[in-house]
Regions:
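Active-site nucleotide/adenylate-binding loops and adjacent lid/helix of ATP-dependent enzymes
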Residues: 1-30, 40-41
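Oxyanion-binding "anion nests"
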Residues: 26-91
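Conserved metal-phosphate-binding beta-hairpin within the catalytic cores
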Residues: 25, 36, 95-127, 137
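A long amphipathic alpha-helix within ATP-dependent nucleotide-binding catalytic cores
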Residues: 11-20, 65-111
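Short, charged, low-complexity patches
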Residues: 84, 141-148
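Flexible, glycine-rich terminal cap/loop adjacent to redox cofactors
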Residues: 122-144, 156
Length: 159
């Protein structure tokens, strides 16, 4: 949103649905994400960096769950090794601090001035053919069947 009237209208609309709302600062930057997988022995594996590039300013439901020509999803390969390592370490740290189990997709913004901003964690990320989590894990050389076996093994261990 770029004007006070847009903010007022959005807050008014939100209050129609609930009396508690969250207003966040808009962060301009690239939307990047890391798949984190916990092996049975507790080792955390962090994937390469995935990126969502949308023509629109907002990554909508339709773009996430339907075939969209407006959005490109893939491996981000233009960041330095140092930045990639820092993002992966932050993803694993978020996973640990929140005491996650099994898997999560950790999303960040990477701003034009090089700031890494935690956005959200998805403790049950999508597994559709369009979903980033399985693509990122398979890019690490872990097959889909290995991924499922790792998750089942971890669940049995924790049970």
């Amino acid at each position: 949103m770029s004007s006070a009237s847009e903010i007022r209208d959005a807050v008014s609309e939100a209050y129609k649905h609930h009396n508690k709302i969250v207003v966040e600062e808009g962060i301009s930057g690239r939307e990047i994400e890391v798949a984190v997988l916990e092996r049975r022995d507790g080792e955390l594996i962090a994937s390469r960096i995935g990126e969502i590039v949308s023509v629109d300013r907002f990554y909508s439901f339709d773009e996430k769950y339907k075939d969209s020509v407006k959005t490109k999803v893939g491996i981000c390969d233009d960041l330095s090794d140092e930045i990639v390592c820092e993002i992966q370490e932050q993803a694993k740290a978020v996973f640990k601090v929140l005491e996650c189990k099994g898997l999560s997709r950790v999303d960040f913004f990477y701003t034009d001035d090089g700031e890494i901003c935690f956005n959200e964690i998805n403790t049950m990320p999508g597994f559709t053919e369009h979903s980033m989590y399985p693509k990122l894990i398979m890019d690490k050389g872990i097959s889909y069947s290995e991924l499922i076996a790792t998750l089942v093994d971890g669940a049995i261990k924790d049970f």
